[in-house]
Amino acid sequence: MLEVSTLRSPKADQRAGVGGHHVVGFVPAPPSPADVADEVDAFIVDDSCLLEYIDFSCCDVPFFHADDGDILPDLEVDPTELLAEFASSPDDEPPPTTSAPGPGEPAAAAGAKEDVKEDGAAAAAAAAAADYDGSPPPPRGKKKKDDEERSSSLPEEKDAKNGGGDEVLSAVTTEDSSAGAAKSCSPSAEGHSKRKPSSSSSSAAAGKNSHGKRKVKVDWTPELHRRFVQAVEQLGIDKAVPSRILELMGIECLTRHNIASHLQKYRSHRKHLMAREAEAASWTQKRQMYTAAAAAAAVAAGGGPRKDAAAATAAVAPWVMPTIGFPPPHAAAMVPPPPHPPPFCRPPLHVWGHPTAGVEPTTAAAPPPPSPHAQPPLLPVWPRHLAPPPPPLPAAWAHGHQPAPVDPAAYWQQQYNAARKWGPQAVTPGTPCMPPPLPPAAMLQRFPVPPVPGMVPHPMYRPIPPPSPPQGNKLAALQLQLDAHPSKESIDAAIGDVLVKPWLPLPLGLKPPSLDSVMSELHKQGIPKVPPAASGAAG
């Protein structure tokens, strides 16, 4: 059976200074025989005084006591202000009833608490046994009235019996509360002092982030960059640091972050420039090496002691890579025209940067002054398959001999056009020689022209077709028909192919002969009679 008992609250005693404030609690009591028989649990509670005995100060924070220290979150309070407030109002705190407890007093206080609890439990059991007289339980209403009277008289009896225990308990609880308050005050002050630097630093960082100035982008003007470069060169590109550069520049609007960022970009750009300069220097060095090697070869081929100003200049000047395979106009104008070139001949194509036939290698880099007796070698242009074999090149290059004169008749085109009434004619000096029209495709396939070094192959030449003549010009139409008629050589070649391979179909443009034409041709040849089988086969 549970019975209501009163317990003393240490906090209430500390606030009021004297006893008298109680807290309602439930203390287990030994069951009586009547209760065991009836199996009824009785709670003796005084409804009129219940609210007065309950202490609501500890109900806000469950599972904690008010003197346990810092339970609520710590606020930004300066410990010095808190101590000054406590020192200014000493009357608010209750005066301590006893002095500070010694080392052995906590154990004695704990023993006194246990004795008080045991005495209270024994007194409650004795009172319950004395009240029970073995009579049957009263009616419900009467039982409720007796319970009220008993609950009202019970606190007075407990106060009378446990007077000495209450004094000891109040003294012990007062001392414990004062010591606990001192301990809780000191850890709170320590917590304030420990957390103040971190909280102040966090508040300072928050203030800087919220109220601080935003990063301003620096406009690096040419003058500002010039001063930056001067400072970097003064310190050295490898030893320059942002702080020293900022000191040397002496500009207040710049920060160390701006200098560090610009220094990184400057070093990267300078690295790329140095790489490009190194590459250009390597190319220049290679050109100088090639020029020196060419000059040494020219001196060795020329005989040694002969060194003129042109050779010295060529040895010093760097070699320039040619961009096209043809000489510039001013170089072509310096070469005089030949006095008497052979017909159907022209000078060979000169590639810029390469020596020409019949000229010493020393003149390739810097040609000597023109001499009236020196004539550039001339080679035939067309047709190539009729030209005699040229002399060996090493002898001509090494000794500078001129090739033997060639009969111009060997280069004449042995053709006669009856319609145009022209034949082989001599070419007057100074007449430009151009390549003739392309031969038919069949001729090109059967007689391919061998490639000539320095000359563009024939298939690369694209003849420009003549413009179409007007409809009323009969002479122009006749001329066009004559040009479109195949030549005799091409017809003979096609007929020869047909006679060699009669089983193949006739090429385009050839038709089988008719019977009348064959018979007339046979009569012309002196064959008057033709057997019928041959005529049938021919038909």
Swiss-Prot record:
Region (Disordered) residue spans: 86-218
Basic and acidic residues composition bias: residue spans: 144-161
Induction (free text): By light.
Ranges of residues in domain HTH myb-type: 212-271
Major place of residence: nucleus
PANTHER family: TRANSCRIPTION ACTIVATOR GLK1
Function: Probable transcriptional activator that promotes chloroplast development. Acts as an activator of nuclear photosynthetic genes involved in chlorophyll biosynthesis, light harvesting, and electron transport.
This protein's UniProt keywords: DNA-binding, Nucleus, Transcription, Transcription regulation
Tissue specificity note: Expressed in leaves.
Compositionally biased spans, kind Low complexity: 99-111, 121-130
PROSITE patterns, per database record: HTH_MYB (PS51294)
Identification of the protein by name: Probable transcription factor GLK2
DNA-binding span(s): 242-267
Domain of life: Eukaryota
Record Pfam families: Myb_DNA-binding (PF00249)
InterPro entries: GLK1/2-like (IPR044825), Homeodomain-like_sf (IPR009057), Myb_dom (IPR017930), Myb_dom_plants (IPR006447), SANT/Myb (IPR001005)
